């Protein structure tokens, strides 16, 4: 085994670090493939969701900054995954009577969301429901705010699903879609390969706007962050 000393060139240290990074990336790819990002399953799915709780933090917080939060609101997070977005929303709502509901059609995702938010579920501030965006098990006009973060890519029928979202949103309520990639010139080869590999629905800003309008949303606003591939789209019921 070769030991690295403080006298070795800095370039050698950087090479070693890059090698470790490459191994980590390969491991993450394996976990993602086995875990199935479209519908997380098994232990690899749980590992992937916990990683996504961290990796989605920046884009989520950037997008949530555009929203106003009411401490008495009832919010829904569609495709709640590992549950971190639910917690971020409740934190921004602050003390009060507000409730955040998470929905996901993956059993593993629901388990992870419940695990992460067990204290808030016990307190009555959260609940998690296993269901699909295509058939949300809620009455019309149930929510003041609805979000979906890094989930829209996998919706089988985007237009009908958005209409279902609008159905359960209260009049004048807000819906926000958040994604860390949108269709544009200059996307990296790795991003393009992932879009193809995982069969992701990735739209241009104008296509998102048109889709929201077709689903019946008004006051549609599209935000993109310069220097990134991030996008968030807001619509009002």
Q: Predicted regions span which residues?
A:
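N-terminal auxiliary segments of SAM/dcSAM-dependent transferases
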Residues: 2-30
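C-terminal alpha-helical "lid/dimerization" subdomain adjacent to the S-adenosyl-L-methionine
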Residues: 25-53, 174-234
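Conserved alpha-helix/loop element of class I SAM-dependent methyltransferases that forms part
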Residues: 54-73, 88
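Short glycine-dipeptide loop
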Residues: 72, 96, 169-175
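Class I SAM-dependent methyltransferase SAM/SAH-binding core
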Residues: 74-135
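A short acidic, Gly/Pro-enriched loop at the edge of an enzyme's catalytic core
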Residues: 134-145
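A short SAM/SAH-binding and catalytic strip from SAM-dependent methyltransferases
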Residues: 145-157
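A short glycine-rich, Lys/Arg-flanked "PGG" loop and its adjoining helix->strand segment in the class I
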Residues: 159-171
